[in-house]
Amino acid sequence: IAIVGVFFFALQYAAQAGWSAGIKRIPLAFGSWLPIAGILMLVSFFVFGHDLFHWTHHDLYDTTSHEFDSIINAKKAYFFWPLSEHPSTPVFFIARMLFFFGLWYYLFTKLRKLAFQEDLEGGTASWYNMRKLSAVFLIIFAVTSSIAAWDWVMSIDTHWFSTMFGWYVFASWWVTTLALITFITIHLKEKGLLSIVNENHLHDIGKFVFAFSVFWAYIWFSQFLLIYYANIPEETIYFVERWNNDQYGIIFFVNLFLNFVLPFLLLMPRDAKRHTAILKVVTPIVIFGHWIDFYLMITPGTLKENGGYGLVEFGTMLIYGGAFL
């Protein structure tokens, strides 16, 4: 959400959009979470890495061990280079994580500085500089966000891969961020702030939530259909573990309902996207729905059939959500 908020901000300048002038500082503020997120990611990896990522177990690369895995061994350079001949510390993986967060935060601070200059000095110089930097940011984001999705999510199921996974994760990030921007905009407006924001602005951002919920469903179905129709065991196992499982089977369909069916039906009428009462109901559901989506991406790969959902899962979500806000 932090980096996609900055993406939303940069997109407005690259596209020369004017409608979002009253709300663009909300997603820009999300970027302040980036250094905290980077620290939490590093701590989580060093503390829980062996539990989260199967590829971190050294026996998988030892040809004399009964745990040796030829498929994972073929990918060791992606994680351990330049120590790939003697895998111990995943230097390349950690370096990418540090590089991504460092680069994202650097670009965020540059955009924020230019935004403040535009407010203080006026004129068009800062605007043109922001537009150029935003275009650069969008290109960098396109590459780094996809690789981050491979590293932090897809590598949990180390044997499995999907060429659409970067797009799929981005779609989930994007819809969640749009829903949060909408919810915070409504909250601030009801508190007497953002007087410039009217029903037309809510309608525009509501259309974004509606349209990209459909986009998420399109990417989900495209990935699912290709794998289902090809019926290659190495690929179908990803969905089998989530569909034919007592722990995840129900959530599999709840995910589709919350992230596509519900927002599609509730936000289809024009008036629904213009009134705060409906948007205040739909957007938290969408945010929670995409938390469910990431739960399905991560938990079956780490806990297998031992996964569940209870106070720990929901409590963690509330703690991180509260800290972010």
Could you tell me what each predicted segment is?
Residues 7-30, 180-200, 253-260:
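Cytoplasmic juxtamembrane interface segments
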Residues 18-21, 194-198, 238-241, 265-279, ...:
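Alpha-helical transmembrane segments
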Residues 11-24, 54, 112-117, 157-158, ...:
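Juxtamembrane/interface segments at transmembrane-helix termini
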Residues 2-120, 134-137:
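Transmembrane-helix bundle segments that line or gate the permeation/cavity pathway
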Residues 68-70, 75-254, 272:
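Long, contiguous internal "core" modules enriched in hydrophobic/ aromatic residues
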